[in-house]
Amino acid sequence: MAEIVDVRAREVLDSRGNPTVEADVVLKSGVVGSACAPSGASTGSREALELRDKDPARYMGKGVLKAVDAVNTSIRSALIGRDAREQRELDRIMIDLDGTENKANLGANAILAVSLAAAKAAAQEKGVPLYAHIADINGTSGQYSMPVPMMNILNGGEHADNNVDIQEFMVQPVGVASFREALRVGAEIFHNLKKVLHDKGLNTAVGDEGGFAPNLPSNEAALAAIEEAVTKAGYKLGSDVTLALDCASSEFYKDGQYNLSGEGKVFSSEEFADYLGDLSQRYPIVSIEDGMDESDWDGWAALTRKLGDKVQLVGDDLFVTNTKILKQGIDKGIANSILIKFNQIGSLSETLDAIKMAKDAGFTAVISHRSGETEDTTIADLAVATSAGQIKTGSLCRSDRVAKYNRLLRIEEELAGSAPYRGLKEIKGQE
């Protein structure tokens, strides 16, 4: 038994300088597992609750001492003496202790930090890498693959202070045989994009996730800049590298319309679906995330009808890693992929349940960071353990993003060929 003898938490800072929860789970053997909860900027309204203190005298109300206290008192008392290897049991205890649908009492940030810390402690106790332990929990031991990275190299929306409406413009190096090579391709494109923007007299400052955030006249201008960077890096757009968008449409949806203020355009749901379809015909865009507002299910149905057989349509704010909402989407034929952010649901077990439900329905699952990250690299292990096939963890700068890429490099080296990199085959509609 990997007996838990202590559970403790502290307030630490995330990559945006805001407080978040770090938890330690201590075992009788002396092993300590530590993990941090991430935090989002553009958030779905149905996400599990991130408990903040709302004390304006500390961190402008964003302190997390209440969540830390929940870990140090009620969660600690409930978990001491339990077996850290029994992940689902630990998560169930914390969920029951909270007693709400959205983890509003203890906070999803408190529960998740402990959930992940327990998994790390159990992995250390077993003497196995974290991905191997997560695969054991998930029933996917030995079925590993390396994920295709969606590299967010140009930012707009809530992730940047500019006039570009679409939140993320991403490259996916699909025409290579390993994650290591994919990372190299992405880095070379990133550096070439910086030069392209600089030569046009544009800002090369970066946003929350490490992507560039210049003022551009349109979303298409962002795609054209990336196309130029891909070419300058010596790669071919469409075969070596494909494109992905995160529209984060809920951020510009108002009164039943999509308002692209940067371009001075307003669209109905059908018109915006056509707009995205037009972009994906003119550029090799193979994945579109949150192409419609989270509440616009008719719009999602239209988008899926128009593009669902050839473009991966990822629900983030739409599904918020929640199996109940995902099941509704599956039943109604809406979207064909889910973004997985474990702080949207608040525990490792529930995250694994969402991935399994998606895969069983023929959906893909894209493992994702948040805009407020830490040095914690658990999502890298999660992607490999579940053979998810795709990961979103930002651009090719900022240590909070690069840490995940470097963890994946080490995992690929460790697995020595037993975790294939499948490229385009991992993306829905491109199999």
Swiss-Prot record:
Belongs to the enolase family. It catalyses: (2R)-2-phosphoglycerate = phosphoenolpyruvate + H2O. Its cofactor is Mg(2+). It holds the Pfam family Enolase_N. The active site is at residues 209, 341. The keyword Nucleotide-binding does not apply. Mg(2+) binds at residues 246, 289, 316. It is an enzyme of class 4 (lyase). This is Enolase. The gene is eno. Keywords: Cytoplasm, Glycolysis, Lyase, Magnesium, Metal-binding, Secreted. One of its GO terms (molecular function) is phosphopyruvate hydratase activity. Pathway: Carbohydrate degradation; glycolysis; pyruvate from D-glyceraldehyde 3-phosphate: step 4/5. InterPro entries: Enolase, Enolase-like_C_sf, Enolase-like_N, Enolase_C, Enolase_CS, Enolase_N. Catalyzes the reversible conversion of 2-phosphoglycerate (2-PG) into phosphoenolpyruvate (PEP). It is essential for the degradation of carbohydrates via glycolysis. Its EC number is 4.2.1.11. GO terms for biological process: glycolytic process.
